[in-house]
């Protein structure tokens, strides 16, 4: 594999994208065209010291692609509007659906692979389960415009008759890890817990508003960003080496396959700081109650079936690594 080959990475200033950029650098890939809205100052530290060939503003990408002489070997499309509390669907539609269609169509035209970020938010309240088969997206009812936009693009992709050389859409579950601080309100519960502990010595969690879940026992599939980028890199290598099988194209869950409680998560955060747990339960805002997922758990059988063998971080190990090696020392990945 030629490590000088050009890779396009969208969302490169963001949380997962900047970690992906560093992981590519660590593996000898530096000819990377990074794409994002680089005007956001809080994100600058995520990307400015990493290695890349050119930084292109998100809205200029397609003009640049038309003029670009070198054909990229793959596009890793992680850029999106990810705010689950942004209820204006048109914002999500523009960035998460229409923009993604343009990326897809470019990959089709150039016959190059595409890996893009979908989301577990597509699964809604989980009434239809968490299987990453290709029938389910047409039944799903996401709880917010973000989840809806991701599901709309998944459905659109599945209905196409022309495809990129290879393609996968990855349904990220609850991702946590370094380089997420710019997300603030939308950052992981671990990030919020760490900051609450530092400030007040106590972590506030939402009470449960369902009788079948105790306070703090709401369950999520929390996945460490280091696991995510390993999977994306594994797929990238197979695709650009022509070792990916077209029969494996499609949607994939990306969690750990094991749901854990918010209480477990917060306890692990306290433990990472060598402190006793101190949790207080507060009322969930009314406007969130109908839009809240009480349980998510990725069915990971499909990714395992196609040959991915790496073990995922346990919640305790992932949180410990994040807290001790990044949050407590204020380091970036």
Predicted feature locations:
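C-terminal substrate-binding subdomain of Rossmann-fold SDR/epimerase-dehydratase oxidoreductases
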Residues: 199-333
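Conserved hydrophobic helix-helix packing surfaces used for dimerization/oligomerization
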Residues: 6-7, 75, 251
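Catalytic helix-loop patch of NAD(P)-dependent Rossmann-fold dehydrogenases
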Residues: 94, 98-102, 109, 122-169, ...
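Glycine-rich phosphate-binding loop and adjoining beta1-alpha1-beta2 segment
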Residues: 34-61
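Residues at the starts of beta-strands that form the adenosine-phosphate
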Residues: 6, 30-32, 113, 166, ...
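NAD(P)H-binding glycine-rich loop region in Rossmannoid oxidoreductase-like domains
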Residues: 49, 58-95
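SDR active-site strand-loop-helix element
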Residues: 10, 35, 75-79, 114-120, ...
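N-terminal Rossmann NAD(P)H-binding glycine-rich loop of SDR-like oxidoreductase domains
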Residues: 7-27
């Amino acid at each position: 594999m030629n490590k000088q080959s050009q890779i396009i990475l969208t969302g490169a200033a963001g949380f997962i994208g900047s970690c992906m950029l560093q992981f590519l650098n660590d593996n000898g890939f530096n000819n990377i065209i990074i794409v994002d809205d680089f005007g956001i100052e809080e994100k600058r530290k995520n990307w400015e010291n990493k290695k890349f060939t050119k930084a292109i503003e998100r809205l200029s990408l397609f003009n640049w692609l038309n003029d670009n002489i070198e054909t990229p070997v793959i596009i890793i499309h992680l850029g999106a509007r990810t705010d689950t509390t942004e209820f204006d669907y048109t914002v999500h539609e523009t960035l998460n659906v229409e923009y993604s269609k343009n990326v897809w169509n470019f990959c089709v035209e150039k016959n190059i692979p595409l890996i893009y970020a979908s989301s577990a938010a597509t699964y809604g309240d989980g009434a239809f389960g968490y299987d990453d088969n290709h029938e389910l997206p047409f039944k799903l009812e996401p709880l917010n415009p973000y989840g809806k936009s991701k599901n709309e693009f998944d459905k659109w992709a599945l209905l196409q008759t022309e495809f990129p050389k290879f393609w996968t859409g990855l349904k990220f579950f609850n991702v946590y890890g370094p380089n997420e601080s710019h997300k603030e309100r939308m950052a992981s519960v671990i990030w919020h817990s760490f900051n609450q502990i530092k400030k007040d010595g106590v972590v506030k969690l939402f009470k449960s508003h369902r009788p079948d879940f105790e306070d703090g026992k709401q369950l999520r599939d929390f996945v460490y960003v280091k696991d995510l980028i390993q999977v994306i890199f594994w797929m990238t290598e197979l695709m650009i080496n022509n070792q990916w099988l077209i029969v494996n194209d499609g949607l994939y869950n990306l969690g750990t396959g094991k749901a854990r409680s918010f209480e477990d998560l917060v306890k692990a955060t306290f433990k990472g700081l060598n402190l006793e747990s101190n949790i207080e339960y507060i009322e969930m805002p009314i406007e969130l109650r109908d839009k809240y997922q009480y349980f998510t758990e990725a069915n990971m059988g499909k990714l395992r079936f196609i040959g991915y063998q790496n073990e995922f971080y346990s919640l305790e190990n992932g949180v410990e690594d994040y807290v001790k090696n990044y949050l407590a020392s204020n380091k970036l990945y």
